[in-house]
Amino acid sequence: MRFGDYRVEVISDCEFRLDGGAMFGVVPRNLWSQVSPPDDQNRILMNMNCLFIEAGEERILIDTGIGDKWAEKHRGMYAIDRRRSLDESLRAIAGIGADEVTIVINTHLHFDHAGGNTELDDAGKALPAFKNARYFVSRAEYEHAEAPSDRDRASYLPENWKPLKQSGQLELKEANYEVVPGLRMETHAGHNRSMQCPRLEQDGETLFGFADLVPTRAHVPFAWVMGYDLYPVETVEAKKKLLPQAAKENWTCLFYHDPDQPLGRIFEEDGKYHVARVS
């Protein structure tokens, strides 16, 4: 779709499943299961909705999904359902291949956001999947990924960024920065301290990617926060700041993990926030 002078597309990596209890934290199962029905292993269906932006000569991909480097054991654990590769999705939806992407941005380096940064060659070595792209990651996130805590260590897989460092394609950015005119990455703490969200502003319109602050439409209520969040109180505060603004200014919002409706608009009704479909 056109967004001001830019073209914007949602590029799905694949479907997968994570434990519903972990995804909804302290929210009781009898509540979250009404909006995100679990399977027989208590896992809920999710997607990875990467954002493609064509801005002049720049072809930008924000997040790269879970990737295709997984052993069969983990494919089963996460119920990874890949109907086509990220490169095939790019070609089908955006009309370009991976080699034509010029900038890759990771909101953070968790494996479900950075897994497609690299791919395996015939010898099983991880190499950059976007051979002609610069990769942007916040310096704080990179430093945390290099020395994670015991609580989130399993979310960081070095093969998703070390090959980028070795190839010279990785560029470390500060907390808030402009990618191209109108597109900024801004840090919002909660999920961790260094996750960044994209904000695209064109002709008075705003597109905002919530990354893992509001991973699905079901997470819009302030208190519906993931158990994965390192700083859940800060997630709530960020949502209290951003959601009213999104409703007031009629933002187009991207929900990275929503399996059915990646884009929506926030609206307030009777003191609660909801999501309307973007036509």
Region spans (language model):
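Cap/insert and terminal regions of metallo-dependent hydrolase folds
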Residues: G76-E88, E201-S279
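Metallo-beta-lactamase
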Residues: D81-I96, E100-D112, D122, L127-T187, ...
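Active-site metal-binding loops of divalent metal-dependent hydrolases
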Residues: D13-C14, T64-G67, L109, A140-E141, ...
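Residue-level marker for the onset of beta-strands and adjacent loop->beta junctions
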Residues: N47-N49, A175, S194-Q196, P262-L263
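Metal-dependent catalytic neighborhoods of phosphoester/phosphodiester hydrolases
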Residues: A114-K125, R265-I266
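Conserved beta-strand hairpin/beta-sheet module of binuclear metal-dependent hydrolase folds
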Residues: R2-A92, C197-L213
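Hydrophobic/aromatic beta-strand patches that form the interior of the parallel beta-sheet core
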Residues: E9-I11, I105, F136, E171-K173, ...
